[in-house]
UniProtKB/Swiss-Prot annotation:
The organism's taxonomic lineage, starting at the top: Bacteria, Pseudomonadati, Pseudomonadota, Alphaproteobacteria, Hyphomicrobiales
Gene Ontology molecular functions: structural constituent of ribosome
Stretches with biased composition (Low complexity): 111-121
UniProt source species: Azorhizobium caulinodans (strain ATCC 43989 / DSM 5975 / JCM 20966 / LMG 6465 / NBRC 14845 / NCIMB 13405 / ORS 571)
Listed Basic and acidic residues bias regions: 85-110
Entry keyword set: Ribonucleoprotein, Ribosomal protein
Keyword Ribosomal protein: yes
Gene3D superfamilies per UniProt: 3.30.1320.10
Protein name (Swiss-Prot/TrEMBL): Small ribosomal subunit protein bS16
Length: 121
């Protein structure tokens, strides 16, 4: 049985509220779970203390038992100091896209032509 620490959605339409639960990976998102270990309210301000509540002792115990957190829950656990999340490296994100590179090359070519024309006169 593969265990996941994940979010189970609750709340009304357009008013999400999540429980942080330990559940079997095969069970539905909002379905049966083994234990509730916290809550997440995305409608609160990012610096609000009640935005994420987490029972750290229960979370640590489930991590030791082999439960795998989802990406979002891993962020919460990292913020709580229970899990070290490795930084993702995406070197292509910093460089401009294909069209922007083409435009920059065109601008550089026009600037070079203009400087050649100015120096020739």
């Amino acid at each position: 049985m593969s265990l996941k620490i994940r979010l189970a959605r609750g709340g009304a339409k357009k008013r999400p509220y999540y429980r942080i639960v330990v559940a079997d990976a095969r069970s539905p998102r909002d379905g049966r779970f083994i234990e509730k270990i916290g809550t997440f309210n995305p409608l609160l301000a990012k610096d609000a203390a009640e935005r994420v509540t987490l029972d750290t002792e229960k979370a640590k115990a489930w991590l030791e038992k082999g439960a795998q957190p989802t990406d979002r829950v891993a962020r919460f656990l990292d913020a709580a100091g229970l899990l070290k999340r490795e930084a993702r490296n995406n070197p292509k994100k910093a460089e401009p896209g294909k069209k922007a590179q083409e435009r920059a090359a065109e601008r550089a070519a026009k600037a070079a032509e203009a400087s050649e024309a100015a120096s020739a006169e």
